[in-house]
Amino acid sequence: SQEFYENMLRGHIKNKDVLLYKDGAQIGRKSMFREGFPHEICCINEHVFILRTNELCTQNYLYFWLDQPEITQKIRNLNANAAQPGINQAGVKGLPILLPLKSLIDDFENISEPLLAELFNLAKKNNLLRKTSDLLLPKLISGDIDVEKLDIKSINGVTV
């Protein structure tokens, strides 16, 4: 609930946060939150790290660095508890990150940022379409919404 979220002292997700799952079956899985996707407001629990960069690197670079198979394997190898798979904060802070020249990171950002912005924008639109479909389809099937008199001849050049 909104009240629960507001009472949380830690773990609030910010735009472009990179999340790293630290235990369980999904250890090493990465996510990025942007522009309210997948949720407008969100917070994490104790099973996830929020990773935020400093001025040496960008969130986009960090996400793609972590998403490499070799780095994912290094993360999984940090597993400090065989009974319950998991990684700790010290292990994550000790992960190597190759930082190219700042100019190259800036170039990467200039290329990746508009692509990621569009990707997340389309993902939000897909969610909205899915929700709209979930609301409308049962009403259409049951006849609650009558489409007999709709004047739809074509949609985007496709004859209906």
At which residue positions do the language-model features occur?
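Sequence-specific dsDNA recognition surfaces
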Residues: 1-19, 32-33
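Low-complexity, Lys/Gly-biased intrinsically disordered segments
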Residues: 1-9, 26-27, 80, 88
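Extracellular/lumenal ectodomain signal focusing on beta-strand-rich modules
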Residues: 15, 29, 94-96
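Short, ligand-facing micro-motifs at secondary-structure edges
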Residues: 18-21, 25-44, 60-64, 73-78
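Short edge beta-strand segments in beta-sheet-rich domains
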Residues: 43-46, 90-92
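Amphipathic alpha-helical coiled-coil/heptad-repeat segments
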Residues: 56-57, 61-65, 72-74, 78-81, ...
